[in-house]
């Protein structure tokens, strides 16, 4: 990925987080979880560190289905149950609308 593409991703991620904020005041029952959006980027960890880390708190490389995914644990979400899941899904959905390949990483606590 070029620096310009990475900067665009950082911008798109902020927009996706703003989109997910609509779920901030919803119920938060259900199982406590670590659900987080994930995105496939053609970038190295060094590129992510330089360009996108200010927009993110944590990045995790995780092989899934033979592909490299960055799990966005630091994406802005609230809650620890259903609300967290809804916000993670909303971020993933919005990034997909921006033409990124996305999924949601689901993990119960």
Regions flagged by a language model, labelled:
Residues 40, 45, 69, 105-108:
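Charged, low-complexity intrinsically disordered segments
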Residues 1-65:
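N-terminal leader/targeting segments
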Residues 64-65, 69-72:
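A short alpha-helix capping/helix-coil boundary motif
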Residues 71-109:
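Short, compact, well-ordered microdomains
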